């Protein structure tokens, strides 16, 4: 484990660098990195030694503090979605009961996949994978101190959790959002001076339906839309409204997106799902997408780890053009 990587994923180090920089925004209120670091220090002795540490991950300050504290301790986190019923949560926990708890020493987090087919699988993501994903994202999407990323989706999903790690590494701010509703979401964009936000296509559809006159402020640099394919109709509406949309494609197993719309093209409607991120390799064989790169998971908990440097079968149908554009059909 490199000292540089530990430094990047340390909120205490961030506080030493810029104690007065804004780390968290919430409905107009601000929390600096210095204050956030103190809250993390206060909670460190209370965490216990569970490996992994089970955490119901909500888009709130308590979750944020615990995640950063666990990253500070290099203690693996097991994220559970707050929307699960008690029965669903117990079913997931039962599926991992009895599994070997000897994780790789660099394990950062275990996230359950979306479970579109069968029981969700626990994917092990290392600190290196999270950092590689953040760096690949930042190569296309400029994120720096002063930026604010709205956490409008649960950090129990990789799309939400990656906002925490990207922002920490960039020393930028996270805006904590309430339960999604178009009206409140748009209000928070303004009140918290949001520069980036990540949503799914259904959320964008709801915004257009309930607030057809909405146009983005100059603060908003990009709206990342992913988690599912975006229809051509939705792309066209976004372009007509002058909304800077970055389409994304990725999954839990790749520590977030591996394909994105080029930042310079965010105001234009583009074909497909975007272009391959720097440091990622994607190929299509018989119409199926295979992925290779340092942001890949270690493997699924309880199964053999992935072979380093090998191609990962995404399970998705798609095509890759010669210019690096990827198309994943609806």
What are these regions (language model features)?
Residues 2-8, 19-20, 98-112, 119, ...:
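Conserved pre-ATP/AMP-binding loop-to-beta segment of ANL
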Residues 32-33, 108-135:
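Conserved AMP-binding A3 loop
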Residues 195-199, 208-267, 281:
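Gly/Ser/Thr-rich phosphate-binding loop
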Residues 127, 251-271, 295-296, 303-306:
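Active-site loops of AMP-binding adenylate-forming
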Residues 288-330:
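Conserved ATP-binding/catalytic segment of the ANL
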Residues 2-3, 7, 20-48, 86-93, ...:
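Conserved AMP-binding/adenylate-forming core of the ANL superfamily
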Residues 132-148, 156-196, 210:
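Conserved AMP-binding/adenylation subdomain of ANL enzymes
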Residues 29, 44-83:
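Conserved AMP-binding/adenylate-forming
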